[in-house]
Amino acid sequence: MSEEKQVGFVTMGDQRAGEDAIPEIGIGMLGYAFMGRAHSNALKKIAYVTWPPPYLPKLVAIAGRNEEAVREAARRYGYEKYSTNWEDVVSDPDVQIFDNGGPNDTHLEPTVAAAKAGKHVICEKPLGRDAEESYEIWRQVAATGVKHMTAFNYRFYPAIILAKQLIEAGEIGEIYHFRARYHQEWVMDPEFPKVWRLDKKQAGSGALGDLGAHIIDQARYLVGEPEKITGLVKTFITERPGGTVDVDDAFQSTVEFANGANGTFEATRFAAGRKNQMRWEINGSKGTLVFDAERQNELLAHFNGSTPGASAQGFRNVLVSEAYHPYWEHWWPHGHMIGWEDNFVHELLHLLTCVKDDSPISPRGATLEDGYRCAEICDAIVRSDQTGQRQTIEYRTL
């Protein structure tokens, strides 16, 4: 009787160093709160979601202003080291990608410095506090030749990518209208304190740059370039515990696109009952598409004449969870839904793939130029509110 071979454990360290080893890429993060947490979580999930990934993200260093908070974040998220000085992250030779999830007033200098140090960069939106600052970030980073990305995460929702595919295939025909709104309620209480998002020096703007930037980018991504725009900007509560509020609570706009479509943009932090509703509707000559971020796995669609019999015409609710839908080959069996956080995985996976393959960030992702163009549109909305006149949108070039 032959003796059976005892295999025992195989040491994974040997496997990782073998011929099929997947290269690591060092990540440096600025910001430990909302976006720093979301991005760190996504980076750690990439290898769980897709195998083999283009790189294995290595969480090298994280920086933030509060030492106690950034130390806790480094421990929770799994970073090797932390600092209260972003320059330590930018200068670290083990960092190849700099992820800027800090407040808006920390976008310009750290992002530019990282690019000049040879790091690929991704920066949260809004890119800068205004168009001038956003242009400077784009101009200086683009000159270095690194990959650069503005973190418009809604571009990576499978239902939104499906909508773009349907539009580009001509399924809804010529686009007539794009109507978008982004509604939240989190600052309605007059006793809610003045935080950095309510401070112009730190944030640049309020609902316009925070929420409006998303729907403006969606408009550009799905429909095309806005050409003329009007704006109404409003602050409802000007005094709060902690000081005077000098940013907007809400805005509304009418817009005319270069391709002849028209539409409306609206965002507010004063919509009672609305937690995080980013919703748009696109009407075309052959149909309509509707998306609501609070039901992110669904796309509401109507196609003229697609259902036999006039009495059965109407909208259909497409559950975007099949393996042939965008990014779903990485996830679960159909009907097993993904959530808000998972779209950051798609976003950062795209960045890693573009770095690995030396492929363009755009059009799937947003570049820093897209971030700058969004800022020009935001500034035009403010000018319209100040002057009472419709504004023509003009972009600078490099």
Spans of features found by a protein language model:
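N-terminal Rossmann-like dinucleotide-binding module
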Residues: 2-77
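Predominantly a Rossmann-like dinucleotide-binding segment in NAD(P)-dependent oxidoreductases
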Residues: 146, 154-245, 252, 299, ...
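Beta-loop-alpha module in the N-terminal Rossmann-like domain of NAD(P)-dependent dehydrogenases
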Residues: 66-68, 77-140
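Core-facing hydrophobic residues within beta-strands of well-ordered domains
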Residues: 57-59, 95, 175, 226
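C-terminal glycine/acidic-rich active-site capping loop/insertion
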Residues: 2-21, 153, 228, 244, ...
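Glycine-rich phosphate/pyrophosphate-binding beta-alpha loops
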Residues: 213, 266-274, 336
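Hydrophobic residues in well-ordered beta-strands that form the structural core
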Residues: 83, 123, 129, 148-150, ...
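C-terminal capping/lid region of NAD(P)-dependent oxidoreductase domains
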Residues: 5, 146, 173-177, 383-398
